[in-house]
Amino acid sequence: MNPALSHVRNWIFDLDNTLYPVSANLFAMIDARIGQYVQKLLNLDAEAAHKVQKGYFHAHGTTLAGLMAEHGTDPHHYLADVHDVDMSVLEVNEALVEALARLPGRKLVFTNGDAPYASKVLDKLGLGASFEAIHDVHATQYRPKPDPQAYQGLCDAYGLDPHASLFVEDMARNLAPAKAIGMKTVWIDNGSEQVPGDADRSYIDYTITDLGAWLHSILETSE
């Protein structure tokens, strides 16, 4: 194990576009369904719905949080609808499965989606038995990443010491609250989110492009 990470006992992973590649286009399908949901709910055309969708995402953390705050949307109905996508696009990444099995300590998924959807994704990826728990949007009381309370709630729920924890995400903005409470942070730079060149990157400890390869590299590094 890389000595710089030898203190890590809790390995926390985002789900979408983190445990599977952006190229699978699974989240792109979900994003499209979210747009359609907003269209139907608010009786808007596609362009107007897209503006509402992205506006809520940036202001509230997720489109769902915005719809709940502004329109009283039922989260269970929303999540069942937008997660009704074809998961045959997902493939098992043997290198990632092996690396996760070798990681010492606890492994958890921290997602703004819900546990039923996350479980289906993990099963398709061959990762159904790789994680101790899934901390989902229901568990955050619908205060999703990057709300700082979501991170503290995760630590409280599982008795995690943030200073002995590492968090992996493809959305850089979701790493800042993790860093603020003492976690090591890993940003997967896979094109799902672009961080401006002049942005403050002090909350990102590691920038990677391939999660499986990076995990193998830290496991095999001794100095």
PLM feature spans:
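Asp-based, Mg2+/Mn2+-dependent phosphohydrolase catalytic module
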Residues: M1-R9, A101, D114-A115, S119-E223
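N-terminal helical cap/lid subdomain that shapes the substrate entry/recognition surface
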Residues: P3-F13, T18-V97, P116
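Hydrophobic residues in well-ordered beta-strands that form the structural core
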Residues: P21, V109-T111, W187
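A generic structural signal for short
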Residues: S23, V52-Q53, S88, R106-K107, ...
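Short glycine/serine/threonine/alanine-rich loop segments
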Residues: L44, T73, G105, L160, ...
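Residue-level marker of regulatory loop/turn positions in helix-turn-helix DNA-binding domains and
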Residues: V92, F110, R143
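Non-catalytic interaction surface on structured domains
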Residues: E94, R102-K107
